[in-house]
Amino acid sequence: YGGSQGNLIFGKGTKLSVKP
């Protein structure tokens, strides 16, 4: 999952820098 996408999908507000 991407950073900002992770925020929108999970709504955790955590930046997961998996995708560049």
From Swiss-Prot:
* Cysteines engaged in disulfide bonds, as pairs: none
Q: Name one GO biological process term.
A: adaptive immune response
Renumbered residue ranges of the record's region Disordered: 1-20
Cellular component terms per the entry's GO annotation: plasma membrane
Q: Which UniProt keywords apply?
A: Adaptive immunity, Cell membrane, Immunity, Membrane, Receptor
Main location per the UniProt record: membrane
Taxonomic superkingdom: Eukaryota
Q: Indicate where this protein resides in the cell.
A: Cell membrane
Coiled coil start-end: none
Q: How does it assemble?
A: Alpha-beta TR is a heterodimer composed of an alpha and beta chain; disulfide-linked. The alpha-beta TR is associated with the transmembrane signaling CD3 coreceptor proteins to form the TR-CD3 (TcR or TCR). The assembly of alpha-beta TR heterodimers with CD3 occurs in the endoplasmic reticulum where a single alpha-beta TR heterodimer associates with one CD3D-CD3E heterodimer, one CD3G-CD3E heterodimer and one CD247 homodimer forming a stable octameric structure. CD3D-CD3E and CD3G-CD3E heterodimers preferentially associate with TR alpha and TR beta chains, respectively.
Q: What does this protein do?
A: J region of the variable domain of T cell receptor (TR) alpha chain that participates in the antigen recognition. Alpha-beta T cell receptors are antigen specific receptors which are essential to the immune response and are present on the cell surface of T lymphocytes. Recognize peptide-major histocompatibility (MH) (pMH) complexes that are displayed by antigen presenting cells (APC), a prerequisite for efficient T cell adaptive immunity against pathogens.
In Swiss-Prot or TrEMBL terms, this protein is called: T cell receptor alpha joining 42
